[in-house]
Amino acid sequence: MERLEEARKRLEEAKRVAVLTGAGISKPSGIPTFRDAEGLWKNFNPLDYATPEAYARDPEKVWAWYAWRIQKVREAKPNPAHYALVELERRILSRGGSFLLVTQNVDGLHARAGSQNLVELHGNLLRARCEACGKRFPLPEAFAPPPFCPACGHRARPDVVWFGELLPEGAWERAERAFAEADFALVVGTSAEVEPAASLGRIAFASGAYLVEVNPEPTPLTPLAHLSLRTGAVEGMALLLPPSPEDQAEGHLS
């Protein structure tokens, strides 16, 4: 309990907060993770669906899989952990601090919950990107895959980062800078195994940030964390960010 109280105190006093989230934060919303016992990669080989080579071989197969995932994402709703991060952002910004949320997730749930200062490191399932002109555009509620670019009419691909691809331009630089400058870093629901995102916690620690991890299982980041909460994202965020009397009176974090 002493470590938890210390973490809460540090968070209340923090001026520069950086947060990294992974698949574990969206699991309570019904979005499957990738690497646990029930994860997507247990039933689907990533080399068959999530590489440029797989798309070049069989774009229809890849799009059919993504259309299924997109439907799952549209059916999902943000959960209390997503909303807790929206509230954390509000608190930090209201006292003149800086806040950046970096997510490895492509489900768009952080944006739907209301997060403003957000970097979607691996893209967004609800967008497509033209293979010819590069235009990004939101996918309509109903579409027949593959979609076509509204600007030039060329076929579009999912606007996500596949294995072997570079991150979106500027995304990594913004994320790295936020974690290097943070005085409080929070890592929620990630195995801390996928680079380069896995290095963000280490960057923050090396720069002197107070580091908190929320994950049911230990990760490579655990030995560095000042506090590791061995629990799910919803429970962990509730422990770390209990509502203040003012928030309860105003209806925040309800």
Swiss-Prot record:
Keywords: Cytoplasm, Metal-binding, NAD, Transferase, Zinc. Pfam families: SIR2. Zn(2+) binds at C130, C133, C149, C152. GO terms for cellular component: cytoplasm. The active site is at H122 (proton acceptor). The keyword Iron does not apply. NAD(+) binds at residues 22-41, 104-107, 189-191, 215-217, 233. Its cofactor is Zn(2+). Binds 1 zinc ion per subunit. It is an enzyme of class 2 (transferase). GO terms for molecular function: histone deacetylase activity, NAD-dependent; NAD+ binding; protein-malonyllysine demalonylase activity; protein-succinyllysine desuccinylase activity; zinc ion binding. Substrate binds at Y66, R69. Its EC number is 2.3.1.286. It is found in: Cytoplasm. It comes from the Bacteria. Residues 1-250 form the Deacetylase sirtuin-type domain. It catalyses: N(6)-acetyl-L-lysyl-[protein] + NAD(+) + H2O = 2''-O-acetyl-ADP-D-ribose + nicotinamide + L-lysyl-[protein]; N(6)-succinyl-L-lysyl-[protein] + NAD(+) + H2O = 2''-O-succinyl-ADP-D-ribose + nicotinamide + L-lysyl-[protein]. InterPro entries: DHS-like_NAD/FAD-binding_dom, NAD-dep_sirtuin_deacylases, Sirtuin, Sirtuin_cat_small_dom_sf, Sirtuin_class_III, Ssirtuin_cat_dom. NAD-dependent lysine deacetylase and desuccinylase that specifically removes acetyl and succinyl groups on target proteins. Modulates the activities of several proteins which are inactive in their acylated form. NCBIfam families: PRK00481.1-3 (NF001753). PANTHER family: NAD-DEPENDENT PROTEIN DEACYLASE, NAD-DEPENDENT PROTEIN DEACYLASE SIRTUIN-5, MITOCHONDRIAL-RELATED. Belongs to the sirtuin family. Class III subfamily. 2 residues (Tyr-66 and Arg-69) present in a large hydrophobic pocket are probably involved in substrate specificity. They are important for desuccinylation activity, but dispensable for deacetylation activity. This is NAD-dependent protein deacylase. It comes from Thermus thermophilus (strain ATCC BAA-163 / DSM 7039 / HB27). The lineage of its organism: Bacteria, Thermotogati, Deinococcota, Deinococci, Thermales. The gene is cobB.
